C-alpha cells in the first residue's frame, strides 16, 4: 500500500497537491528528481520532497514558491495522498482538556475528517489519521506536524480517473486563509510522517518511536516540584517555606511557583498578562525570599508564566493594545500578537526582567486559552512562526 514507490506513481499534480489561487487550480503534469516530485509553471513551483528511513517511516516536506514577477494570492494549499479504491476504515482521535486521546475507527462511506482550528494545534483533534484496508488487512498511519490551523480529510473520490480512489487531503486549514506570496517567496507546508502498519491495535507504533529516538533524542528531565500540585494557588510564605525544606530533603532539583504569584488584587486571574508580583495577596512582594531559600537549599528556582494570554482589563492590554489580539466574546481573553515582532520583543523584555530579578532557572510556559480567528487571514501561519521565533530568541538569550 505504501512504500517509496508510491511517489514514483501518478503523473497528475492532483495526486500530490490540492490548491488554488489567482493562478487558478493546481493541476497538470508532475516531474521527478532524486527524492522529489514537483510541478513548475510560470506562476509557481510546487515541491514534494520525501525520504524513507530504515524502519519504513516516510518524511514528506511540501512547499510552494512564487516564481513569477508579481504577487500571487493563495486561497488553499494542501498535500494529498491517493490510494486504490476498496473498503476502508478510518481512525481519528479527539483531544481536549480532561478528554484526551479519545480515538475510534470509522467505516468510510463518503468522508471522514478531523481538524484543529485554534492556535493550540491539538485542541479538539489530534493531527493524525490512520487508514485500514479491509481487503488487504493492512493500513497507513499519517501524522501531520502543524505549523498553522489544520485539517485532514479522507474521502472516496472520483476525480482522478475512471475508478473511485481513497484520497487523503491534509495541511493548513482553508478557513480564513488568504495568503499573498511575493515574488520568490516560499510557503512551507506542514511536515508529514507516514508509514504502513499491519497491527491494527497499535498501528506498528514502534516505527514512530524509532524515528523519534533518532531525530529527537530523549532528554533526562530533572526532578521538579510544582506548588500547584500541593495547594493550587494558595501561596503564602508560611505555606511555601516548609514545602521548600521538604522538597530539598526529597532530592528535588527544581522548585517552582505556579499560577497566583502575580497581579494587583485579590483575584489574580483578572490580571493575567501583568507579570509583576502581587503585593496584596500571595507573597505580598516577598517572593524573592522564597527564591533565595530555594537556592540556599541547593535547588534551582522556577516560575509559571503564560505570555501568550492577557485579561482584557490587565495593565498590559491597556498599555499596549496594539500588541494584543482580542479573542471572541465567549473566551473574553486577549492574545499576544506573536506575528508582531515589536510585541515579541516587548514580552521578551518582560521575561528578561523576571529572570534577572528572581534568578529564574526554570520557566513553566503554560498555554491555556484558544483563539480561533486569525486577523491576518493566514490560519495562524504567521502567529505560529512568530511564536517559534519567540521561543528561539528566549533560549538564545538565556541558554542556561
Give residue ranges: language-model regions.
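Short, well-ordered coil/turn segments that N-cap beta-strands
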Residues: 219-223, 251-253, 295-301, 359-361, ...
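Conserved, mostly hydrophobic/aromatic
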Residues: 62, 184, 225, 247, ...
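Polysaccharide-binding surfaces and accessory modules of carbohydrate-active proteins
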Residues: 1-160, 175
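Short Pro-Gly-centered flexible turn/kink motifs
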Residues: 179-197
Amino acid at each position: 500500500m505504501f512504500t517509496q514507490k508510491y511517489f514514483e506513481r501518478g503523473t497528475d499534480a492532483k495526486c500530490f497537491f490540492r490548491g488554488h489561487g489567482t493562478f487558478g487550480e493546481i493541476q497538470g503534469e508532475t516531474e521527478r528528481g532524486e527524492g522529489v516530485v514537483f510541478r513548475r509553471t510560470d506562476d509557481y513551483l510546487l515541491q514534494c520532497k520525501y525520504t524513507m528511513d530504515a524502519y519504513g517511516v516516510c518524511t514528506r516536506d511540501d512547499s510552494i514558491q512564487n516564481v513569477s514577477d508579481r504577487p500571487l494570492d493563495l486561497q488553499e494549499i494542501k498535500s494529498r495522498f491517493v490510494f486504490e479504491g476498496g473498503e476502508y476504515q478510518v481512525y481519528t482521535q479527539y483531544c481536549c482538556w480532561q478528554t484526551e486521546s479519545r480515538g475510534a475507527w470509522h467505516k468510510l462511506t463518503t468522508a471522514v475528517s478531523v481538524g484543529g482550528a485554534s492556535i493550540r494545534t491539538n485542541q479538539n483533534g489530534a493531527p493524525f489519521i490512520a487508514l485500514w484496508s479491509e481487503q488487504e488487512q493492512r493500513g497507513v498511519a499519517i501524522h501531520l506536524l502543524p505549523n498553522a490551523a489544520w485539517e485532514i480529510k479522507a474521502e472516496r473520490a472520483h476525480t482522478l480517473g475512471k475508478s473511485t480512489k481513497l484520497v487523503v487531503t491534509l495541511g493548513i486549514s482553508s478557513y480564513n486563509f488568504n495568503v499573498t506570496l511575493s515574488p520568490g517567496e516560499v510557503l512551507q507546508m506542514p511536515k508529514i510522517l507516514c508509514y504502513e502498519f499491519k497491527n491494527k491495535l497499535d498501528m506498528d507504533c514502534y516505527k514512530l518511536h524509532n524515528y523519534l529516538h533518532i531525530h529527537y533524542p530523549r532528554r533526562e528531565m530533572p526532578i521538579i516540584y510544582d506548588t500547584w500540585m500541593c495547594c493550587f494557588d494558595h501561596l503564602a510564605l508560611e505555606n511555601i517555606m516548609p514545602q521548600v525544606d521538604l522538597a530539598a530533603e526529597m532530592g528535588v532539583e527544581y522548585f517552582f511557583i505556579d499560577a497566583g504569584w502575580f497581579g494587583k488584587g485579590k483575584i489574580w486571574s483578572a490580571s493575567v498578562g501583568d507579570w509583576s508580583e502581587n503585593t496584596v495577596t500571595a507573597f505580598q512582594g516577598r517572593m524573592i525570599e522564597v527564591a533565595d531559600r530555594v537556592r540556599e537549599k541547593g535547588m534551582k528556582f522556577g516560575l509559571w508564566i503564560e505570555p501568550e494570554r492577557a485579561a482584557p482589563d490587565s495593565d498590559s492590554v491597556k498599555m499596549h493594545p496594539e500588541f494584543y489580539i482580542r479573542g471572541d466574546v465567549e473566551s473574553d481573553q486577549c492574545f499576544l500578537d506573536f506575528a508582531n515582532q515589536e510585541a515579541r520583543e516587548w514580552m521578551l523584555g518582560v521575561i528578561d526582567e523576571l529572570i534577572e530579578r528572581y534568578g529564574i532557572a526554570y520557566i513553566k510556559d503554560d498555554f491555556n486559552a484558544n483563539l480561533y480567528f486569525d486577523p491576518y487571514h493566514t490560519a495562524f501561519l504567521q502567529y505560529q512562526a512568530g511564536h517559534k521565533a519567540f521561543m528561539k530568541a528566549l533560549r538564545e538569550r538565556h541558554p542556561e
